[in-house]
UniProtKB/Swiss-Prot annotation:
GO terms for biological process: ribosomal small subunit assembly; translation. The gene is rps19. Keywords: Cytoplasm, Nucleus, Ribonucleoprotein, Ribosomal protein. GO terms for molecular function: RNA binding; structural constituent of ribosome. Component of the small ribosomal subunit. The ribosome is a large ribonucleoprotein complex responsible for the synthesis of proteins in the cell. Required for pre-rRNA processing and maturation of 40S ribosomal subunits. This is Small ribosomal subunit protein eS19.
């Protein structure tokens, strides 16, 4: 659909569609250790979804589309959560820096994002085009079901 952007569609549906696109393209470099790793020290278990790397990549690209200029540290804050400490009070804990770094590096290899001279990463023109195209597909699919 012309004129539809990422901001116009449901974020959950968009992230699922973008993750499916990244998986289907086969170009996203997925590390070997994805089935062994936790996503932060606040997590007790590894993710149960085997496609979590594609979903995290799609979520990261969407975040960069909305608020460019985010780096590894920003991504760890976004994906952080409450850490339970047993009988002690809970505190905030950041997400895994290695996962955030590998996601950003994999997206750089796809030429969807690039390093920003002011710090962090930002979307490329090709990345913006891809995201708007997928948003148009999601909007068209929603229009058919309504």
């Amino acid at each position: 659909m012309p004129g539809v952007t990422v901001k116009d569609v449901n974020q959950q549906e968009f992230v699922r569609a973008l993750a499916a696109f990244l998986k289907k393209s086969g170009k996203l470099k997925v590390p070997d250790w994805v089935d062994l790793v936790k996503l932060g020290k606040h997590k007790e278990l590894a993710p149960s979804d085997e496609n979590w790397f594609y979903i995290r990549s799609a979520s990261t690209v969407r975040h960069l589309y909305l608020r460019g200029g985010a780096g590894v540290g920003s991504m760890t804050k976004i994906y952080g959560s409450r850490q339970r400490n047993g009988v002690c009070p809970a505190h905030y804990s950041v997400g895994s820096k290695n996962v955030a770094r590998k996601v950003l590096q994999a997206l750089e290899l796809l030429k969807m994002i690039e390093k920003d001279p002011n710090g962090g990463r930002r979307l490329t023109a090709q990345g913006t085009r891809d995201l708007d195209r997928i948003a148009g597909q999601v909007a068209a699919a929603n229009k058919k079901t309504v």
